[in-house]
Curated annotation (Swiss-Prot):
Membrane topology according to the record: Multi-pass membrane protein
Domain of life (superkingdom): Bacteria
Gene Ontology molecular functions: potassium ion transmembrane transporter activity; symporter activity
Xref: PANTHER family: K+ POTASSIUM TRANSPORTER, OSMOTIC STRESS POTASSIUM TRANSPORTER
One of the record's GO cellular component terms: plasma membrane
Key words of the record: Cell membrane, Ion transport, Membrane, Potassium, Potassium transport, Symport, Transmembrane, Transmembrane helix, Transport
Pfam families found in the cross-reference section: K_trans, K_trans_C
Function comment: Transport of potassium into the cell. Likely operates as a K(+):H(+) symporter.
Catalytic activity as recorded in UniProt: K(+)(in) + H(+)(in) = K(+)(out) + H(+)(out)
Name this protein carries in UniProt: Probable potassium transport system protein Kup
Compartments reported by the entry: Cell membrane
Provenance organism: Bifidobacterium adolescentis (strain ATCC 15703 / DSM 20083 / NCTC 11814 / E194a)
Stated family: Belongs to the HAK/KUP transporter (TC 2.A.72) family.
Main location: membrane
Amino acid sequence: MAIVALGVVYGDIGTSPLYTMQTFLNGQGGLAHTDRAAVLGILSLVFWSITLITTVKYVFIAMRIDNNGEGGIFALYSLIRKYGAWLAIPAMLGGAAFLADSVLTPAVSISSAVEGLETLPLLEPIMSGNKELTLMITIVIIVCLFAVQSRGTERIGRTFGTVVMIWFSFLAVVGLVNLSSDWSVLEALNPVYGVEFLFSHHNAAGLAVMGTVFLSTTGAEALYSDMGHVGRGNIYFTWPFIKIALVFCYFGQGAWMLNHWDDTAYNHMHGLNPFFEMMTPSVRYVAVLLSVCAGVIASQALITGAYTMVSEATRLNWMPHLQVRYPARTRGQLYIPVVNAVLCVSTLLVLAMFRDSEHISAAYGLALTVTMITTTILLAVYIWHDGKRVGAVVFTVVFLAIQFLFFFASMAKFLHGGWFTMLLTLAILLIMYTWNEGTKLERAQRRHMQPADCVPVLKRLHEDDSIPYFADNIVYLTSDPEMKRVDTDIFFSIFADHPKRARAWWAVSVETSDNPFTREYSVENFGTDFLFRVRIRLGFKVSQSIPAYIHQIMNDLSKSGDLPKQTTRYPKLDADPNIGPIRYVLIHKALMPESKVSQKGAISLQIKYAIRHLAGSPVKWFGLAPYNPLIEIQPLFLATERPPRLKRV
């Protein structure tokens, strides 16, 4: 399991050495403008950032705070939501920023690895300076990566872990080999070098260099988010090895820079990458192969994380219900086609706009600083209410100070492409916020009826032979989980302008269980043979094509005598003599022009309904399309006010 943990949680942080020092050199104006103070300074900042942010904040503190073993910003919010409604805002913002940054991770990880082909002597005549070919190879890999998502990654998960273990071992070895040429770089373990460099004239980038330093910590949030997949113990067990490998690699690159800063061959080399240059040409072939694999694995981890986060947001009613597939036997392995398509298109758009890793990394990380800040706020709230108030204050002051420094430093990336991820963050935040607000308004007007109030009226309609049958069975799908009541919307639908008389009315809700192959149902008939409340529980691997299950339930009740036999004079598609025709009805809400609702509420509802229209239809989710379901639009009653009276003239 520890090996699997490597593949799941360390892919992102494991690709940071590919581009962190390259971005540093670009910001300093090249290797020729980088002296010993600059190299020791950046190494010190990187080491202490990994130590404080990744090790202390996430590994030592955050992982002790879990929600039934699950980590991540949404799981954390679910744990503390009772302490204030305002906590939804940082949780939404952090989740939106994490999803936005997921678009850049595949682009920067894979493109930086593919660009290593340009350093291979055998391919240099073809690849050198040929940015278009590098871009095309990157695009092909990314398209293939997204194309195979629907097949699941369970079978290759253990392979991922093995590859990442080899990758980190490789980072440690090549770093140590170069470090052995100049052990003096270990002086950078002293934090004074980092602080002095940050404010010295040796630092051409100024405080913006912290935006580059932050790249070395970009996988830290994934450690916490994926805790539920691999377990806290496995991360505790493997993290020391990971950190040592990262330190060796970064310090090895530092030693190489110190040994070659005055080498004229590198003075005017554009996009110089110390990671590949510190290796001999023969070793670079292995490095490129492993780095591409590591980039794919890092991308896979972020894609899987995006699926999980969207699924969690749906359960919090912050996002619409989307079609979810489970290619594997575990619920953690899920696939959401809409999310996959959006991520793929957005990643390709990033590649089209920024072209190479140098420009992508210039935009990378800005949104993730927002996620880390919001996670710090939520963690501080938990620690505060856990009775450790002094610890909460110290934690908040220390880590917000560091992360706001990262944020303001990364704001220098805004005009260089950071605007794209911030725009994406705001778009996702808008979806979450308006969906949540719209859902609150809908629930505020939702009413329910007790059996004593509705059964007598339904009985009269059931026995009223003057009204023709609308259908033998009318099935309403409802999201209400309670079995001992009936949604008022269903009652209104039945007694609309033309009452829907039936031999039986059905209110059906569908729940998804954690057991992959659950197939069970429960029924409440309220002491009647014409009104049934049904709850169907299906495993997450089971098809949610409802008609087949409804038909089986009706047959079971008919055989048990709870449902009278329904004979029909005309042939039916299913040729079942005991069950009459079935009509499905779905109720959608719509805002009335005269509804008394605030402008903000009206906008939230309008956006929610627009998103719902684009996100897909329950008709497709529940396999109802062949049955021609009736979709009813019911008004959303929100303290409606009487319209002004007309004057007769």
